[in-house]
Design a protein with these regions (language model features):
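Conserved N-terminal alpha-helix of the aminotransferase class I/II PLP-enzyme fold
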Residues: 2-146, 265-266
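Conserved PLP-enzyme active-site core in the AAT-like
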Residues: 121-130, 134-311
Length: 311
């Protein structure tokens, strides 16, 4: 409540009680103010009441919740079921615009603000998790495989002659299909057995680059988190190789945010060589429902280019 309404409340209930309630609410508002000011992940998690207060404050900023509003335009948030509306805290519009997922939606100031804050907080989390030099990221409503496809499709505009993606093998279908769906031919590099671990065959990767011609290779598609006995790819060496041959490098970091080792490998790879983007799943790392991912990178302009590719 604003100060005028609180003053009116004091005419109905004892002013001392109203002041206590006002102070309690101010505690919630201070947390929200800190988030708006810093755009970083809170050191201590919010209570559900603070989260719900904030979401409701944002929701009333969207035009579908304006009092007396009747949306009849092409881009209106309309939901038939009140159950569905409540489930989404009446944030009905969605985010972005048809040309850019990162753009502000004019009729949804609250949803747009929530999106900007989400990307800012997630960027902070990636830095805290070990990738200190990450420059930009954004959340997409797609699982990891489709998010990788989006990265490959963006690279197509930069490397129109490229047909191949060099991929150290991992036995998981979605990352394999992500390359085929984007229209490229995966060049599968078998791993080598080192002790009781399967590791990246760097010699074969380099030989494939030389055989195919660097200009015909869209990127190297490496992996951090995977199933035993395979260990994370040798990101530092691959990143150095990509820098040497001027080939993009996309990292499948599906499970990796929760692993300091995986995040360290990405940071080191970017430091010594080239990593253009790395993709991680929301459900695996943040324990939310399946169907979201984070696309991040070290060149802000390239990450923005990917976001503008989102249809």
């Amino acid at each position: 409540m604003n100060i005028e309404n609180l003053t009116l409340c004091e005419k109905i209930v004892s002013p001392s009680y109203i002041r206590q309630g006002s102070q309690a609410r101010r505690g919630h508002e201070q947390l929200i103010r800190h988030l708006l000011d810093q755009g970083k992940c809170p050191e201590e998690g919010w209570s559900e009441s603070t989260v719900e207060l904030f979401l409701n404050e944002l929701a009333v900023m969207d035009s579908n919740n304006f009092l007396g509003n009747c949306g009849v335009g092409e881009r209106e948030g309309r939901v038939a079921s009140s159950l569905v509306a409540r489930r989404h805290y009446r944030l009905i519009h969605g985010i972005g615009r048809s040309g850019d997922i990162a753009a502000v939606q004019p009729k949804a100031a609250g949803s747009s603000l929530l999106n900007k804050l989400t990307n800012s907080v997630v960027l902070d989390i990636l830095k805290i998790s070990g990738v200190r030099s990450v420059a930009s990221c954004f959340v997409v409503p797609m699982a990891t495989g489709m998010s990788l496809t989006l990265c490959f499709l963006t690279l197509r505009h930069r490397r129109p002659k490229a047909r191949y993606i060099i991929w150290p093998r991992i036995d998981q279908k979605s990352c394999f299909k992500s390359m085929i769906t984007a229209g490229f031919e995966p060049v599968v590099v078998e791993n080598v057995l080192v002790g009781d671990e399967l590791r990246t065959d760097l010699e074969t990767v380099q030989r494939k680059i030389q055989e195919l011609g660097a200009e015909n290779v869209l990127c190297v598609h490496s992996t951090t988190s995977c199933f035993a006995p395979r260990v994370p790819d040798r990101l530092e060496e691959l990143a150095t190789m990509c820098a040497k041959y001027d080939i993009p490098h996309i990292v499948n970091n599906a499970y990796g945010v929760q692993s300091s080792k995986c995040m360290h490998l990405i940071q080191q790879g970017a430091r010594v060589g080239r990593i253009d983007a790395f993709v991680q799943s929301l459900d695996k790392n943040f324990m939310v429902p399946v169907g979201g991912a984070i696309i991040a990178g070290f060149d802000e302009s390239f990450v923005q280019e990917i976001s503008k590719m989102y249809p």
